[in-house]
Structure formats: C-alpha cells, structure tokens
Regions:
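Surface-exposed loop/interface segments of Gram-negative outer-membrane beta-barrel transport/assembly proteins
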Residues: 1-28, 70-74, 80-176, 194-302
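Predominantly transmembrane beta-strands of Gram-negative outer membrane beta-barrel pores used
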Residues: 36-37, 44-66, 70, 82-88, ...
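Residues on the lipid-exposed face of transmembrane beta-strands in outer-membrane beta-barrel proteins
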Residues: 47-51, 83-87, 177-183, 241-245, ...
Length: 320
C-alpha cells in the first residue's frame, strides 16, 4: 500500500500541524510495511513408490513441506502420507479401489492486525524503544504518563510487536479415505453394482498466547495477556450405491443405459468452547461458556435414476 515516507510525513506535520503534534515527531525513517513483510520461502519434498505385490497393485507417497508466509511469524510445516491399492477379484469381475491420505501440520498464524497497523503507524518512530527499552518487550509504543497502563489508549500498537509478541500456534490434522467396489455380475455382465464409501475427518487445535508485558496484552498491575486454547473437529461421511445396466441392441442399432442409486452424505462439525485465561493461566471473570461445545450437522440423502436410449448413435432419449 502506498503511504507517506517519514520525510513526507514530517513535512506535512511541520507545515500544517499544531505545536503539540510537531512535538510528537520522531527522527527515524521507518517503512513499517518493510518491517512486517518478508520474502517467503518454501520447500516441498515428495517420495513415491509404486509396484505390485502378489498381484496387488499399490502406490505409496510421502511428503514433507515447509513454508514461511510473506507476513513475519507466519509459517507451517506439513507431513503427509498417501496409500493407494487397486486389486481385482473373480477374474476381473470385482474391482476394488482403496485410497487413504493423511496429513499432520504444525503452524504458527501471524497476527493479521499488524497489516493495518503498518499502514497507519508513524513512520518517524523507530522499531525499538530508546526510552524505557525494558518496557513492552523493547518495542516502541506510544506512551502517556497520565494513563494507568502508561500507554496512549487511542494510539496504534507497534506492528512488529503485534507479530512477535503473539503466538497463535496450531496442529491441524486431516485424514481422507475412500473405497470403491465395482462388481460386474457373472450371470448378467451387462449389469454392474457400484458401492462407494468415503470419509473426510479433520481436527484443529491450538493455543493463543500473548505476554502480559506486551502492549497488546498489558493491563494495570499485570495479570493480563492471553493464554487460550481452541479446538474444532469436522467429519464428512459418504455412502453411495448404484446399479447400472448397459446393453447394446445390435438388431435395433440401439443402446440402453439405465442407472438407479442412493446417496447419503453427512457433515458434522464440533466447535469446542472454552473460558479465557491470562498469560499466567488465571481465568478471566465471566468468561465461562454457556455450553462446552456446539455441533452443527447437515445430512443430504438422495435417490437418483437415469435412463438413456440411443439409436444408431445419432438419436438420443434421456430421462432422469
């Protein structure tokens, strides 16, 4: 975002500002957006092995990824594994496709509030304090002697301090599985039965910690900051079954394709609710949740059918 440089900002304040406003100007030349952003780096390593053991085709994949965000302190580390099996039985009348995937991720999420703070913070001020550097983690902050906290209440907070003094760390986990059976009947090879079962389960949990000595977590007399936990689980299950009959009627130069099936899909989310705690682990008053969790759930059930009739591969009649 285009903003005024420190010299441009000083020039405008010196030209049009009051004496009190001029007195607040600093001597630094800080580009706060340069301070909070960085060049993002990523490594992505994958290993795949495939083959056949006792007539069982298989494929195994392993992955490891690390990535830093363009916003400082934003980063993730992910480990993943995938397995695929594709056996056939009964002289290829029954085909089975099994697929399993899993991932484990460790992330630190940056404080997005620093983006807006970097756009609006005074570019004439330094990143680190030169007066009372032992306070508020050593970051420059706007001070007010008349404020109980020593901080100027309406002023913005140091963008870099907002990033480096907030630890939002989580460990998302996810598992996806699918197995499909496709059976061609021996006594009626034109008829196939297909059963598809699948799931997608994920869990995210973590902590948000803000030091009680940081400007964004400071209160009078200490006992401030944040030390909260969060957790959410999601579960998606699928069952789908259909019969498909396909027959070429050569004497009529036509083809019949009929399918009928059933589908069940369930979505369940569990959000866990917790009280809020200070950085030292003391519970904030009146923060106990009314309910320990809530579980929104949706279920989709479908019956479906389709019939296609083709003549001479030129004329088509379809009903669904």
């Amino acid at each position: 975002v285009s903003v005024l440089s420190a010299d441009q900002f000083r020039s405008i304040v010196n030209e049009k500002g009051t004496a009190a406003q001029k007195a607040l100007l600093g001597t630094a030349n800080t580009n706060w957006q340069d301070v909070i952003y960085q060049t993002a780096h990523m490594t992505d390593n994958n290993l795949s092995i495939g083959g056949e053991v006792a007539k069982l085709p298989y494929r195994i994949s392993l992955g490891f990824q690390t990535q830093s965000g363009v916003l400082k302190t934003d980063k993730l580390q992910r480990t993943s594994v995938a397995l695929s099996l594709n056996p056939t039985f009964f002289n290829n009348h029954l085909k089975v496709d099994l697929s399993l995937k899993g991932s484990l991720q460790k992330s630190r999420f940056a404080n997005l509030g620093a983006i807006g703070a970097a756009v609006s913070f005074d570019p004439t001020q330094p990143v680190y304090a030169t007066v009372n550097p032992q306070r508020f983690g050593g970051y420059f902050e706007w001070l007010d002697r008349n404020s109980p906290t020593g901080l100027m209440n309406l002023a913005g907070r140091n963008p870099l301090g907002m990033l480096e003094q907030r630890y939002d760390e989580g460990t998302p986990q996810r598992s996806i599985g699918n197995i499909q059976f496709d059976y061609k009947f021996h006594f009626l090879p034109e008829l196939r039965a297909n059963l598809n079962l699948g799931y997608d389960v994920s869990k995210g949990e973590g902590t948000v910690y803000v030091s009680d000595s940081s400007a964004i977590g400071y209160v009078v007399g200490g006992k401030g900051g944040t030390n909260n936990i969060y957790k959410q689980t999601k579960q998606n299950t699928l069952l789908e079954f259909y019969l498909n009959y396909v027959k070429d009627l050569r004497f009529l130069k036509s083809r019949v394709d009929v399918m009928a099936g059933y589908s069940y899909n369930n979505y369940l989310t569990t959000n866990y609710n917790y009280a809020s705690y200070t950085a030292s682990g003391e519970k904030y008053p009146n923060t106990d949740p009314a309910f320990p969790f809530d579980k929104p759930e949706n279920t989709l059930i479908s019956f479906f059918g389709r019939a296609n009739y083709a003549v001479n591969n030129r004329y088509f009649l379809t009903a669904t």
